Amino acid sequence: MKLNISYPANGTQKLIEIDDDRRLRVFMEKRMGQEVPGDSVGPEFAGYVFKITGGNDKQGFPMFQGVLLPHRVRLLLRAGHPCYRPRRDGERKRKSVRGCIVGQDLAVLALAIIKQGEQDIPGLTDVTVPKRLGPKRASKIRRFFNLSKEDDVRQFVIRREVVPKKEGKKPYTKAPKIQRLVTPRTLQHKRHRFALKRRQAEKNREEAAEFAQLMAKRVAEAKQKREVVKARRASSLKK
């Protein structure tokens, strides 16, 4: 069985193949989400604590959280379920998924390091992979650099270097567009929107008042006409 071990604190992961079933015995009959000590896996994992995050069986079917079985089942999946990406709105599909209990039929078991042990694992805990992109939202940039509301966020955007594909061209830097950035221009747009809204509301009120007056006038005219017709009919009956 292969162990795909990830270390979220450093952003690294490593695939380790283990042939001895006795070293893997500690994972058997455990469920996804459970924490397992890594002492019996090998001396290099002494003191480590792993969390089972998933896995695939020998045919490639992924483990599904919540299915308390050590084998494959066919489930009707919809949007929002793991292991399924709908192609159309409202689409559902019956797909084969592996239960969340670890067994011998797994080819790869995914683990995350919850607690680091005594010694480093080469290529996993001794290496740090920096994030490729920095924060993009204005409030997150402020939190990241501990800025106040008076500081200009645009000066603290993390730029990344882009190497052109064509030879001979110099590398250049790119910065993301800051989202939810409050500037005088955005405030002016907001004031303009509210002014348009107020103007439209006033116009609607005036039109409603005019329409009410017109309706009252038409109702009065119709009433007068009915009274004239009624009087004419009464006078003709007297004759």
From Swiss-Prot:
- Superkingdom is Eukaryota
Concerning Gene3D superfamilies, the annotation shows:
1.20.5.2650
A Pfam family matched by this chain, by name?
A: Ribosomal_S6e
- Give the record's PTM text: Phosphorylated.
Gene Ontology MF, one: structural constituent of ribosome
Q: Does the keyword Phosphoprotein apply?
A: yes
Chief location category: cytoplasm
Q: Keyword Ligase on this protein? A: no
Kindly list the GO CC terms recorded for this protein: cytosol; cytosolic small ribosomal subunit
What is annotated about its quaternary structure and interactions? Component of the small ribosomal subunit (SSU). Mature yeast ribosomes consist of a small (40S) and a large (60S) subunit. The 40S small subunit contains 1 molecule of ribosomal RNA (18S rRNA) and at least 33 different proteins. The large 60S subunit contains 3 rRNA molecules (25S, 5.8S and 5S rRNA) and at least 46 different proteins. Interacts with snoRNA U3. uS11 interacts with MPP10. Component of the ribosomal small subunit (SSU) processome composed of at least 40 protein subunits and snoRNA U3.
**Role according to the record:** Component of the ribosome, a large ribonucleoprotein complex responsible for the synthesis of proteins in the cell. The small ribosomal subunit (SSU) binds messenger RNAs (mRNAs) and translates the encoded message by selecting cognate aminoacyl-transfer RNA (tRNA) molecules. The large subunit (LSU) contains the ribosomal catalytic site termed the peptidyl transferase center (PTC), which catalyzes the formation of peptide bonds, thereby polymerizing the amino acids delivered by tRNAs into a polypeptide chain.
Q: What else is known?
A: There are 2 genes for eS6 in S.pombe.
The protein's name? Small ribosomal subunit protein eS6A
Protein species of origin: Schizosaccharomyces pombe (strain 972 / ATCC 24843)
Which classification does the entry list for the species? Eukaryota, Fungi, Dikarya, Ascomycota, Taphrinomycotina
